[in-house]
Every structure is written in C-alpha cells, then in structure tokens.
Amino acid sequence: MLKKYEALSEQVNPTKTLMAQAVINRYIKKTSLTHYSELSRLIGCEAFVKHENHNPTGSFKIRGALNFFHHMSTEELEGGILVATKGNHGLAMAWAGQWFQVPCTVVVPQDNNPEINRIIESYGAEVIVHGEDFYDA
C-alpha cells in the first residue's frame, strides 16, 4: 500500500488533477466561487474566494480523502485506515471512511479540541487520544 500511496503523493500533475476532480465530483457538490469586490480593491486585483468551508467536513481536506479511498482496492482497505491529526484531516478521513464503509482510527493529541473528537466519532471512526502534541499522536 505504501507504494500506491507514494504514487498518489507525486508532484502536481495537471492531468491527474483533472482525473481527481472527476472522482471527487462523484461524491460531493462543487463549492461556490465568489468574487469579493472589497477584497479585490484592497489587494489591487480581482479576488475570488472558493468556499471550501461548505464541504461536508468544513475544509478542502475531504477532497484528498475521497480521492485516496477511491483509488485504494478493497484488499488495501481491508484492515481499515489509521491517521494522526489535530483536526481537518481526521474529520475528512473519518467522513470518507464512513462513506466507503472502511473502519477508520484517528489518533489525536491530549489537548485536542473535544468537539473535533466528538465529530470524528460521529462519523463512525475510533478516536485514540495519545501524546502531548501532533507528533506524539
């Protein structure tokens, strides 16, 4: 699985980006792109904001999680997924794991926001609290 994960982590490739977009669009709605005139005035060019906070888990991280799960085989996902995070990555992996019916375990540090932990659990993932910071988790 590591080799396949490394392939998903390659340098940005426009063709693969478009392929990922097609995959992601099967699972979540496109987020709005809004022109902000005041921001445009302040920075001296046209400014558009992509509202990734409107995604199911509140961030763009769900895109990577969905693309990851989509490209893994049933055998590769058989034992479930284990991730370490303080927030958005864990939320996204837990949500996508629930969608793909793959068990997900999320390791978080001791000082993690309890509300984030609760939401991760609400997506069906197991939360393990370990360590003083993200790196320990």
Go through each PLM region and give its residues.
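PLP-dependent amino-acid enzyme catalytic core
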Residues: M1-A137
